[in-house]
Amino acid sequence: MSHGDYKAFFAAACAGDVELVRHHLDAGVDVDFVHPELQSTALVAAIEEHRSDVALLLLDHGASPTLVSPLEAMTPLQAARAARLDRVVARLSRAAPAT
């Protein structure tokens, strides 16, 4: 899997640009790549920005439901609970072990 244009992918995830995120995923960006400068995953960053649609898209494309994002030191499920994103919490609760 390619890192591709990870910075643009990460920015699109944070901005909630579902179509641009999909474009980068289709181009082979590693969905679980940790941003080298921000030390965060796109999934946790999108969750923290309250981007439920992006978070669900990332999960649909194989984002790990258990990968701890280094900067935040939390799993996607922990981040979704903190952000009160019920749809994302429900999806992650089915996929991840209890935390």
Please place each PLM-identified region on the residue numbering.
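Alpha-helical adaptor scaffolds
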Residues: 10-45
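Ankyrin-repeat-protein effector appendages
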Residues: 1-11, 81-99
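Ankyrin-repeat and related helical/solenoid repeat scaffolds used for protein-protein interactions
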Residues: 40-74
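Conserved ankyrin/ankyrin-like repeat signature
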Residues: 20, 53-54, 87-88
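Ankyrin repeat domain, specifically the short helix-to-loop turn at the C-terminus of the second helix
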Residues: 22-30, 56-64, 93-98
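Ankyrin-repeat boundary/"N-cap" motif
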Residues: 2-11, 34-42, 68-75
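Ankyrin repeat A-helix N-terminal signature
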Residues: 11-17, 44-51, 78-85
